[in-house]
Amino acid sequence: MLSSSSSSTVEQPSRGGSPGINAVSSDVLRSNILTRLDGSSLAALSCTCSNLNSFCSDESLWRQQCSATWPSTSDTRVQSIISTFPDGHRTFFSDSFPFLEHDVGINLPPSVDTSELISAVDIFYKDDVIFSRVHVTETVSGWFLCSPMRVDLVEPKELIPTRVLVTDQCKDDTWKSDLEENLSLSWILIDPTCKRAADVSTRKPVSVHRHWLTGEVHVKFSSIFVVGNKKRSEQVEFTVTVVLAVFNRREEETAVMQIREVSLVAEDKDGRNLGGKVSLEILVAAMGMKRRFRAGGEEEGKEKYIEYMERKTAKAEMKWRRGKETAMETAACWIAVLLLGFLLCFYLFMHKNLVAIMKKLIK
């Protein structure tokens, strides 16, 4: 048998059993095996035994996983914040990679000490990065707390070129199915004060449509949270909108898409924008929620969005019907008042004339 005299040799197997993982060199395990795993596989492997847990806890492995999964996390500002997390990049990955549990009600905290939110945003097309940006939002000024919640990553006159090509986009909906299948987005919000993070995106689009006037393509990612307890709860929606402008090349059948807008807003069930204070409280509370590692989270997120929009549309239609009924009742009341007024005036006019005629006859 070979002895484990160096890190590049195979260790001696245990007595009466198979060599197992102990027969693999630690250098081989670190360099050739663990580095080839994705984050979820690495996390699952760390739960198998204490030896593997020790190897899988290597900070460099998780730093590599975070940078490969979200290129924006390589930013120096993000790196400095992640270094303050309890277990560094491993904690950050376990916070950001799973989906948030949206079915559990969020209880708003009495106060929030968060002074800023860091947005680490990456957009992928066919697994290639086409947009990566880090944005800092201060959360203590009166402007943020009292204004509607909105985070914009692209300047008004800025156009970011992409490698997304569209062919015959006006004749069929192939461009739509292509974007629904191949475009993905992660919007990780980081709280430096509480040392927590969460991805508020559904990763896959929940809606893709073309604006009827400008021709721009609006791609929507949405996360819906339940705020409050079962007896008194309300649904709120955090929406990420990506606007793609189509740039046609001369004498070519293909068109290039450019990113015109990447924004995050918060709305209630009636479509009203939430203020910064309430939105911040919801986001901070959501970062402390349970996470879901279940497969098919993108499809589930889209299904929840469709259900939410159906309820929202039904409520809007009911509200419109009630408004219409109220308007008709109000109109009927005014017509009745006008009719009664007309009849009263007619009665007074006739009464006055009859009195005058009677006086003449008496004379």
Curated annotation (Swiss-Prot):
Disulfide bonds: none annotated. InterPro entries: AT3G44326-like (IPR045283), F-box-like_dom_sf (IPR036047), F-box_dom (IPR001810). Residues 1-23 are annotated as: Disordered. GO terms for cellular component: membrane; SCF ubiquitin ligase complex. Residues 27-66 form the F-box domain. One of its GO terms (biological process) is regulation of steroid metabolic process. It comes from the Eukaryota. This is F-box protein At3g44326. It comes from Arabidopsis thaliana. The lineage of its organism: Eukaryota, Viridiplantae, Streptophyta, Embryophyta, Tracheophyta.
